[in-house]
Amino acid sequence: MTQVAGNPGTGETLLRQAAAHYQAGRLTDAEKLYRQVLTLQSGLASAHVSLALVLFRQGRTEESIAAFRQALKIAPDDTDILYKLGNMLLREGGPDDRRIEESFACFLRHARLTFGAGGKGANAPHRVRHDREQLEYLAQTYGLREWKFHLADGERIAACTVNAANAAKATEEWNNRNPRIIVIDDLLGEEALEKLRRYCWGSTVWRETHPEGYLTAMPEHGLACPLIAQIDEDMRAAYPGILGAHLLRYLWAFKYDSRLSGVGTHADPSVVTFNFWITADDANLDPEHGGLTVWNVATPSGLTTQQYIGDTAGCQAYLARAGARSITIPYRSNRAVVFSSDLFHETDMMHFKDGYTNRRINLTMLYGRR
């Protein structure tokens, strides 16, 4: 543990006592001691982080964010602080115009520092196949001959990213449906759609490997470009009747193998889910499938996040007991399925063409907290 200036052992003793109070839930006492430590040595980044965690557990979110910011000023290359501040801003921050921008900047710096040295993912066959195809694409498109961290152009565009032509119809359907499940076609403008595709093709952000056959990109992996921040802004402007005061709280993207399975039955920890697909239609060899199945039953109260996200068999058993009915929305490029996040859903069976740019890609944006 870092020694704090002052009497020998004083800092270490205070930090140990503060940590013990925190672990025991004595948050007021922990806060007092961490502030004492920072009075002795204000440049101790770890103490600012610990104070931030105490403040968050007390429900003092903005003060917690300020403490994380102070820690980052002291240690701007600390990946743990970058991750924590990025997450706090995205998941818990208020309706500040710069919240997403600051969060994404933290995540991008985290990704560059964490993955900049290169290194590939797991050795699962579908991962190896994907990485080989992506490296070929990077060589052809950017002249890259070896595997290393790379982000394609993800800057904002001059045009509006979201096509608002269907907004009125979609909002009316949303307000009249029970359960709330709607489809919005032509979600993004053509320029935004094409640029988002190229960002997903050209960025080595696909860091999580799932045995079913798909890969995941998260904000902390680099799925945090200014274009996505612009899409969020334009989405909230186009669909206030659906999103209301709900803010973007998390996002991810999935990239699939051409024939293997997709995401199993689960629900999302948010209020409104925007799930949209960006791969071109001619890549889909089974146009009546490849989309999303959504059930008309929501997660019961008292279920933990791990139960409704990580337990496909348990979710299916619950749906069977509830006599749930499902609808399957076929895949279409630039189609969004928008639904109440607590509804169970899963990826439909799929069959896409082989080839790197034919891989099915979907983005999920989660709004609000529940």
Where does each model-flagged region fall?
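Register position in tetratricopeptide repeats
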Residues: 23-24, 57-58, 91
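Fe(II)/2-oxoglutarate oxygenase catalytic core
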Residues: 91-336, 342-370
